[in-house]
Structures are given as structure tokens and as C-alpha cells.
Amino acid sequence: MPGRPSTSFALLACVCALVVAAPAQAAPSEMEKRLVNRINDARAEHGLRALRMGARLSRGAHAWSRHLVRADSFHHARLRPGTGEILAWGTCSWFRPAQAVRMWLNSPGHRALLLRPGFRAVGTGWTRGAWRGYGCVEMAVARFR
């Protein structure tokens, strides 16, 4: 069967190309993990259960934080009903996950969202970059479901 080996090779080449082209899902950054830990610390201090890190929420939050920095913007995304989102930013010289959570806890609306008992998962995004005339900012996004 003369045509078989080349057909098999072509099929194998296509499958390999698809595997190589598939985007790898990046693991959460150290800052994104620290933000989840600080959120869960705050929830524990108020007698609430820890939230698990949601992969889909994390991918969306990371992409949104990157978008906000690149677009020089600061606004909420359109999310599915039942999903909450909080944003924060600060200059690179001082802004860390603990400061983001402290800011959220000091704002009644953000505090209510962060401490909502019904949420079970959180995803975080953390992006560093030049933004709105600042040479270096850290942009934090937390999404809850």
C-alpha cells in the first residue's frame, strides 16, 4: 500500500502541530498566590471558610489585570451573574497583596464582597507595568464565585 505511510505521517504531523500550538495555561504567579492567601486570611479572621483557587476565575482575573494596565484603564469587566470582582492598584514601591486586601476591607462595598459567605472560589490577577503616567504600578484583580 504505497500511499499509507505518507498519509500516516501527514496525520501525525498535524496532531503534533496542534499539540505544539495549544496554549499552555500559566500557573498563578507568586503575587497572585499571595493575594489569595491574604484574602483567605481576612476571611478566616471573620469566621469564614477559605476559598479555593478557581482556575477559570484566575485566568480571567489575570487577563483582566493585564488588559487594564495595557489599555491604561480602570473599570470592571462584564461578568456572569453570581460572580464578583474587586480591583486595586498601587505604585510598585509599596503596593503588595496585603495592601490590596487592607484597602478592600476599608471600603464597605469591597469588604462586603470579599467577606460574602456564599462564595466558594477566588481567582486573582496581578500585573506590573506603566499605567496612566506612573512609571510602575501593580494592578490587582480578584474575582469570586
Q: What kind of region is each of these model predictions?
A:
Residues 1-11:
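Bacterial N-terminal signal peptides that target proteins for export
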Residues 10-19:
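Bacterial N-terminal signal peptides
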Residues 21-23:
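N-terminal signal peptide c-region/cleavage motif recognized by signal peptidases
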Residues 25-30, 44-53, 85-101:
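Second-shell loop/turn segments in exported
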Residues 27-70:
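A short alpha-helix/helix-coil micro-patch that ends at or immediately precedes a cysteine
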Residues 45-59, 72-80, 111-127:
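Surface-exposed patches in mature extracellular/periplasmic domains of secreted proteins
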Residues 58-97, 102, 114-116:
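Short, surface-exposed glycine/acidic/tryptophan-bearing loops
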Residues 97-145:
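Disulfide-stabilized extracellular recognition modules
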